[in-house]
Amino acid sequence: MRRFLVATLAVLGSQLSLAGAAAEAQAEQTDFSITNTNVSAVWNQTEWSLTTVDYVPAQYQSRISLSNGYVGASLAAAGPFFEYDLNQTNPDGDEPANVWPLFSRRLSFTTISGFYNIQQNGSGTNYPWLEQYGYESFIAGIPHATGIIFTFGDASLDSTVDPSEVSNFESSLTFKTGVATWAYTWSPAGVSTTFKVSFKAIFSRVHPNLIAVEAQITPSADVKGKVTDVLDGRSAVRSYLADKGLDDESTTIFSAVHPDNLPNITAYVVSTAKFDDKYTDKSSRVEASAPIVSTNGTTIGQTFDIALKSGQTATFHKYVGVASTDKFEDAEAVARKASKDGTSAGWNAAVSEHVAAWGELMTEAAIDNFTDPATGHLPPDADIEILQIATVANSFYLLQSLQPDGSGLNDNSLSVGGLASESYAGMIFWDADYWMAPGLNLNFPSYSKQISNFRVKQYEQAKKNAAFNNYPAESVLYPWTAGRYGNCTGTGPCVDYEYHLNHDIAFNLVQIYNITQNKTWFDDGPRQIIESIAHMTGNLLDYNETTKTYWIHNMTDPDEYANHIDNGAFTIASSADLLFVVNELRRNNGEAINETWKEMSENIEFPTAASDITLEYQTMDNNVNVKQADVILLAYPLDYDQNNYTASDKLLDLDYYSNRQSPNGPAMTYSISAIVANTFSPSGCAAYTFTLNGFLPYLRAPFYQFSEQNDDNVKRNGHQNPAFPFLTGHGGANTITPFGFLGLRTDRPNLFINPSLPPQIPHLKLRDIYFAGAGLHITMNRTHTTITRFSTEGVPALTDKYAGKSMPIEVGTPGDNQATFTIDVGQTVYVPNRLYFENITYNGNILQCKHVSSTDAYAPGQFPQAAIDGAIATAWQPTSNGSSSILIDLSQGGSFEKVSKLYFNWGSRPPRRATVSFGNETASDCHGQRQLNGKVVRVPVTVKPNDPFDAAEAAAAVVKPYVGNETLVSVPGEAWSGKWVKLEIEGCWANGDGDEKGATVAEFVVVGDGN
């Protein structure tokens, strides 16, 4: 059953209720999936805010992530406090851990951009022997700066407040303003007074060194207590104390830390308390001590006596300045000035300018919009409402981790979890260049340039890496992971691993140049990097005298389940494309091309099976299990078309590898599947199924942050500790509308689109995008795409290539351009969409892409829609092998047909039993679930596997296209389609050895008698 209230969502004013009442306390870790009602999330479409009424402490998914691109923090469920995760099943058991390579305790992290330490190794690594050549560089924390703690008697209000003491809870994050809030009633045990409390926090979008917090408290009776401004050192992991103290004759405290093993680098955190004089005894100020604050050596706090009055609200503010010597020579002075200036300006001024700055970024024009342009309302569809919320959240979470170009603070790229997370040790992976940058490049190139600037900054080190590994002069090798230096390390090898990172970097540099046309920037670093990567690639490719082709040996493709293989398809195809691109750049600049690179590009060893399936690597068998998107990346973003790699080959690969995808892979994979399906599918609507799979299983309530895994429970997800928040997932999802639905490509000199909007989505207004320095407003409906060009004069870092003249727009399938439109500034053109989804995959099928529902729980990403989307690349799978069903609605148009046959593709897990029912009426049962009613015609189906899986056979067999288990049933008698069709399945032929998972249905087809 799809247990989330958006399925029966009611629009009340501007609010969409996405979940019901607070879930009861659970023995296990709470399931924060948005497809549950365990944790509430209420969306306000006008304010772009999410609000929860459920207080779920000590679990990372419930924390708000806030940052401003320079400093960021994860804030506790109870308020802007530091918080540890706790073991929800056994208080004495193992502490919840973060992901590789640290496997450290989950906590509310806070740091400064680029504040990396050095240390010999981590708890996890890739190549331990590389540790002898250079230390690791992991993100280091700073003291958690946002806490204001109230104490009455022995009771203190911090992140550990017991849920039994909290009522009327409400916490929200507003994406338009970047303001986080908490409000509730606190009834501390042993204290006769109750308190209405609220907190607000901002990380200033205007002043990158400033954090501001407001706390308000209203007692039910006169009461005396204490208030503490704390800088909590427990988040300063991998850092050590430089200095700390309380300033004399003021209300300022500070804590300064060095990242481990770097005494020449110092971060300063300076907090000034501006507490309500009416209720605060300033003369009582003392240094805070346990148990109010932690005993961590970098913790510092200041405590004041307070006397509150019944029913009167007391207000307390703190203004925190943060700076490190990485970017500010006199970091202490910068931090102190930020704190002082914030205090002088006051809360209202700080919030006002912060909100205005976010308002300039999070505009209606900057966000994809699924509302009906005639009514301004979202369609009454739960999934589209989720897509709308997530689209807003994607942009916010990515942008809040970035500073704009020209700030002097934008050269540390974007880590997997951003500035509020230590997941993956805060290191930089291909995630930034390949997954986060493309969507941001389109409408926020000034911000996305931070990703490119990082690679430019570490260019010299990349040249040293290549020289160390005996590559010729002018070559570069970027390490798989990078921190402060970009050297080759145990976690970040430069050779014998994922060479494709270098190509990913180059392709992003080319694409941001194509978008901005900022040639001054491009020729001052990026162009040289791309050339150097070509030199490296030319040395990496090894000529095979037997095959007369170029090979890559001992490497890893994006699928990290397969290491030390030859000729990874994505890497070797990327090598060929990179060499081609570099020669094109040379040709366009009037330079001689490199003939050797041309010959290499045209003669790579492209691993292909006799069945035309692209092999992920040279020796792959039919038993492959893929971690994440790999071969399908050839279709997009690579748009590879050499070696006679056709559109039909790309579709064949999509079907094959979709059925080889591990359920434990990371979140971004299905964004690629959605784009590829919408580009190359000749029929059906699998692109929409993949789109849902790119969002729904990975989004977490209450604040729509991505998790790396579709199931956060390590006992069920292959023992994977998910990265959180997973900005890579946000980045991938942020590409689906422009690159999938619009079919945009930015890897070529002219704007290229191939529009097709899935039939489930009636309207889409895309974010405004830039290309070749020009600006474009774009809207889509079912049949057409409308494009209006606007002037970009005055937009920083953009040079309109077509200023004063018409701009060409190529429309068609990549590699097969079909039409060219031209557009002037202020002009509108109308481009017909591809309506391929109107084509029926199985001739005569009356169910394809109709509305389908189910009241039964399904496996993550295995949606009921998959059973009728016209593709075997997707499948519906109930969570259990008990009786489960789907109900297809045929009542909306069309005439009834006599049914002649039924066809099923069960995928890899056929059920034991199946029944198809036809009827014209439905009614709710005692559980409120819709069931067929009245006259019902039932057709029992005998199911026997005809393509059973055998691991030994698969390992020995040649690689062949995916088919699945099939059943064809002729329907005798007078069975008519009716208004409703129901498929019930039970059992699973694959069950055994404790496997109680449900069967799969890849395609369910009903064929009318007229076909």
Where are these regions (language model features)?
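Acidic/polar, glycine-enriched structural segments that form the non-catalytic walls/loops
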Residues: 20-424, 815-817, 825, 829-849, ...
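Extracellular carbohydrate recognition and processing domains
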Residues: 932-973
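Non-catalytic C-terminal accessory modules of carbohydrate-active enzymes
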Residues: 130-190, 196, 684-866
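The feature captures the catalytic groove of carbohydrate-active enzymes
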Residues: 418-428, 474-528, 535-599, 785
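Alpha-helical scaffold segments in carbohydrate-active enzymes
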Residues: 392-400, 454-461, 528-540, 581, ...
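Aromatic, loop-rich ligand-recognition surfaces of beta-strand-rich domains
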Residues: 871-932, 965-1011
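Fungal secretory targeting signals
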Residues: 1-24
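Active-site core of glycosidic bond-cleaving carbohydrate-active enzymes
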Residues: 428-458, 502-507, 511-515, 524, ...
